[in-house]
A protein has these predicted regions:
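Short, well-structured N-terminal submotif of metal-dependent ribonuclease cores
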Residues: 1-42, 49-67
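A generic structural signal for short hydrophobic patches within well-formed alpha-helices
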Residues: 16-17, 47, 77, 122
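Residue-level signal for well-ordered alpha-helical positions
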Residues: 22-23, 53, 83, 125-128
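Short, hinge-like loop/turn segments at secondary-structure boundaries
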Residues: 57-61, 87-88, 131-133
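Short loop/helix-cap segments at secondary-structure boundaries that form the rim of catalytic
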Residues: 61, 121-128
Length: 135
Protein backbone atom coordinates (compact mmCIF):
# COMPACT_ATOMS: atom_id res chain seq x y z
CA UNK A 1 0.00 0.00 0.00
CA UNK A 2 1.36 3.41 -0.97
CA UNK A 3 2.07 5.79 1.89
CA UNK A 4 -0.09 8.92 1.93
CA UNK A 5 1.71 12.23 1.57
CA UNK A 6 2.39 13.97 4.85
CA UNK A 7 0.06 16.71 6.01
CA UNK A 8 2.41 17.73 8.84
CA UNK A 9 6.18 17.58 9.34
CA UNK A 10 7.48 17.69 12.92
CA UNK A 11 11.14 18.29 13.76
CA UNK A 12 12.93 16.84 16.75
CA UNK A 13 16.02 18.44 18.27
CA UNK A 14 18.54 16.88 15.87
CA UNK A 15 16.55 18.00 12.83
CA UNK A 16 16.35 21.53 14.24
CA UNK A 17 20.06 21.44 15.16
CA UNK A 18 20.92 20.56 11.58
CA UNK A 19 18.87 23.48 10.32
CA UNK A 20 20.67 25.77 12.75
CA UNK A 21 24.00 24.46 11.42
CA UNK A 22 22.78 25.22 7.88
CA UNK A 23 22.82 21.56 6.84
CA UNK A 24 21.95 21.66 3.12
CA UNK A 25 20.17 18.31 3.03
CA UNK A 26 17.95 19.28 5.97
CA UNK A 27 17.24 22.71 4.49
CA UNK A 28 16.24 21.04 1.20
CA UNK A 29 13.84 18.68 3.01
CA UNK A 30 12.23 21.57 4.83
CA UNK A 31 11.93 23.67 1.68
CA UNK A 32 10.38 20.76 -0.25
CA UNK A 33 7.77 20.40 2.49
CA UNK A 34 7.05 24.11 2.48
CA UNK A 35 6.71 24.11 -1.32
CA UNK A 36 4.24 21.21 -1.05
CA UNK A 37 2.18 23.19 1.46
CA UNK A 38 3.07 20.91 4.36
CA UNK A 39 3.49 22.87 7.59
CA UNK A 40 6.84 22.36 9.32
CA UNK A 41 6.34 22.31 13.07
CA UNK A 42 8.62 22.41 16.07
CA UNK A 43 7.73 22.25 19.75
CA UNK A 44 8.78 25.20 21.86
CA UNK A 45 10.62 22.66 24.05
CA UNK A 46 12.59 21.34 21.10
CA UNK A 47 14.13 24.79 20.68
CA UNK A 48 15.56 24.64 24.19
CA UNK A 49 16.86 21.11 23.62
CA UNK A 50 18.54 21.98 20.28
CA UNK A 51 20.28 25.20 21.31
CA UNK A 52 23.70 25.37 22.94
CA UNK A 53 26.04 28.16 24.05
CA UNK A 54 27.51 28.70 20.60
CA UNK A 55 24.18 28.91 18.76
CA UNK A 56 23.90 32.06 16.67
CA UNK A 57 20.79 33.77 18.07
CA UNK A 58 20.17 35.69 14.84
CA UNK A 59 20.26 32.42 12.89
CA UNK A 60 17.96 30.81 15.48
CA UNK A 61 15.39 33.59 15.13
CA UNK A 62 15.54 33.41 11.32
CA UNK A 63 15.11 29.62 11.26
CA UNK A 64 12.21 29.80 13.73
CA UNK A 65 10.52 32.48 11.62
CA UNK A 66 10.29 29.89 8.83
CA UNK A 67 8.74 27.21 11.06
CA UNK A 68 5.52 26.94 13.03
CA UNK A 69 6.52 26.92 16.69
CA UNK A 70 3.93 25.10 18.77
CA UNK A 71 3.41 25.75 22.48
CA UNK A 72 3.01 22.94 25.00
CA UNK A 73 -0.41 22.74 26.60
CA UNK A 74 -1.78 20.92 29.61
CA UNK A 75 -3.53 18.57 27.17
CA UNK A 76 -0.17 17.82 25.54
CA UNK A 77 1.31 17.06 28.96
CA UNK A 78 -1.47 14.62 29.79
CA UNK A 79 -1.15 12.96 26.38
CA UNK A 80 2.60 12.62 26.97
CA UNK A 81 1.98 11.00 30.36
CA UNK A 82 -0.28 8.46 28.65
CA UNK A 83 2.28 7.79 25.93
CA UNK A 84 4.99 7.15 28.51
CA UNK A 85 2.71 4.81 30.44
CA UNK A 86 1.64 2.96 27.26
CA UNK A 87 5.29 2.55 26.24
CA UNK A 88 5.93 0.35 29.24
CA UNK A 89 6.25 2.97 31.92
CA UNK A 90 9.06 5.05 30.46
CA UNK A 91 10.19 7.74 32.90
CA UNK A 92 9.44 11.38 32.14
CA UNK A 93 12.82 12.41 33.50
CA UNK A 94 14.51 10.86 30.47
CA UNK A 95 11.75 10.91 27.85
CA UNK A 96 9.75 14.05 28.69
CA UNK A 97 10.63 16.15 25.65
CA UNK A 98 10.28 13.26 23.19
CA UNK A 99 6.90 12.39 24.72
CA UNK A 100 5.71 16.00 24.45
CA UNK A 101 6.85 16.22 20.83
CA UNK A 102 5.00 12.94 20.21
CA UNK A 103 1.89 14.52 21.74
CA UNK A 104 2.30 17.40 19.28
CA UNK A 105 2.57 14.91 16.41
CA UNK A 106 -0.65 13.25 17.55
CA UNK A 107 -2.66 16.50 17.60
CA UNK A 108 -1.72 17.91 14.19
CA UNK A 109 -3.28 16.87 10.86
CA UNK A 110 -2.33 13.32 9.88
CA UNK A 111 -0.46 11.73 8.32
CA UNK A 112 2.54 13.11 10.18
CA UNK A 113 6.26 12.63 9.54
CA UNK A 114 8.70 13.20 12.39
CA UNK A 115 12.32 13.89 11.45
CA UNK A 116 14.47 12.42 14.22
CA UNK A 117 17.77 10.77 15.02
CA UNK A 118 16.14 8.73 17.82
CA UNK A 119 14.27 6.05 15.89
CA UNK A 120 14.29 3.70 18.89
CA UNK A 121 12.72 6.22 21.28
CA UNK A 122 10.14 7.24 18.72
CA UNK A 123 9.14 3.68 17.91
CA UNK A 124 7.93 3.47 21.52
CA UNK A 125 6.04 6.76 21.55
CA UNK A 126 4.41 7.34 18.17
CA UNK A 127 0.85 6.73 17.14
CA UNK A 128 -0.29 4.82 14.08
CA UNK A 129 -0.53 7.93 11.89
CA UNK A 130 3.01 9.10 12.70
CA UNK A 131 5.88 7.99 10.47
CA UNK A 132 9.53 8.30 11.42
CA UNK A 133 12.25 9.52 9.06
CA UNK A 134 15.83 9.51 10.21
CA UNK A 135 17.94 12.62 9.80
Amino acid sequence: MKEQPARSLVLDSEALSRLLRNDRAMAARIEASRQAGVPVLVSALTIVEAVHGKTDVSRLKWVLSRLRVEPVSQEDSLTAVGLLRDAGGLHGHKYAIDALVAALALRVPAPVIVLTSDRDDWSKLRGSHVSIREV
